[in-house]
UniProtKB/Swiss-Prot annotation:
Originating species: Rattus norvegicus
Region (Important for interaction with GBA1): 155-191
Family matches, as InterPro entries: CD36_fam, LimpII
This protein's UniProt keywords: Disulfide bond, Glycoprotein, Lipoprotein, Lysosome, Membrane, Palmitate, Receptor, Transmembrane, Transmembrane helix
Primary location recorded for the protein, binned into one broad class: membrane
Name recorded for this polypeptide: Lysosome membrane protein 2
Subunit note: Interacts with GBA1.
Gene expressing this chain: Scarb2
Amino acid sequence: MARCCFYTAGTLSLLLLVTSVTLLVARVFQKAVDQTIEKNMVLQNGTKVFDSWEKPPLPVYIQFYFFNVTNPEEILQGEIPLLEEVGPYTYRELRNKANVQFGENGTTISAVTNKAYIFERNQSVGDPTVDLIRTINIPLLTVVEMAQQPFLREIIEAMLKAYQQTLFVTHTVHELLWGYKDEVLSLVHIFRPDVSPNFGLFYERNGTNDGEYVFLTGEDNYLNFTKIVEWNGKTSLDWWTTDTCNMINGTDGDSFHPLISKDETLYIFPSDFCRSVYITFSSFENVEGLPAFRYKVPAEILANSSENAGFCIPEGNCMDAGVLNVSICKNGAPIIMSFPHFYQADEKFVSAIKGMRPNKEEHESFVDINPLTGIILRGAKRFQINTYVKKLDDFVETGNIRTMVFPVMYLNESVLIDKETASQLKSVINTTLIVTNIPYIIMALGVFFGLIFTWLACRGQGSTDEGTADERAPLIRT
């Protein structure tokens, strides 16, 4: 009986250890899990993946921070602007896909993303319909830019004198965000119907969408899950000066493909930034008990480099690191984009304004992604809207102002997975962990039987050494 147990334990130990090593080397269970995820992460009507894509379950909040001008007269005399940050004014962002249509072969799907904003008073510093902000007059600067066209110059100069426009204006937060009717723009609209008589930083963005997208469903390849192939009927942009800079790359930032490696670069096309950007791995994170890869927008995105030369408008007119001239896609308004407080920008932009305090924790854009599923667990998209301003002798409204990039406001669009969704995702991940760890369980059993085999071997050896009483007796007795 003991001999039988001895050989059984040894055989089982050897078989289990060989099997576990074979399974680990061949990655049998890992491949099975990966293939299951790849198969399920496809946009198909009636699936949970499709429902979550069409109506994202995670709450999204957008916080607006304005820079209130405290020394307007001194600025016009050539002094450094002193700005005071006012905010946040927080809105709940409701988003859903609409006009959804599948392509004939099931590999593409078209949709628009409707967004609506609901004010959250308990998360805000005040009432946007009451609170006043003094800021730079962007409509005025826009009209001044139009005056570079000879046939409009005299008309615009006359209008500015007649309406006594000033470089700094005061409006409510609500007006600055969602729009107000501007006197000068209303007059320009008569000559240029394409110019709206209304101005707002997010005018016509509440309850609307930014155009139709065509996405890949992931049917042909999981790496193509929700990747954009067309926006507003175009497969590429036409604002920039090189084909590379005009490319529409990646997803819209709401989702990513599963099975992400920290060595890969992910691409996003945020239409409000007027260009594609990429994000790179930064660190390992844990969100509500779930593992995550943190990806961030690197400083190279807005670097003054040869790779970004195609974003210089006019061609060759490149600004210093940390800012992007997007006037070409903002109806001619002299809008300059940057990260909040000129984070990661050239020091000259920071020192030109009193009140800029850039820091990583509050001003960096990032996204925490579960690498197994590609699901976003936490994220923050942060960027700042500025305007370019300089003294113009023909326009007294500009006074003796310094040439500078002038901050107007910045936003923080954030998302965080809720506990219920995190719990559901955690159960899925735990199940996959059990499956992928089966080889290790088999190996542990092999080690266990190996220990039994060793114990039996040692016990048997001890019994042999000790022997019976007769065996221990001397051969010759006297």
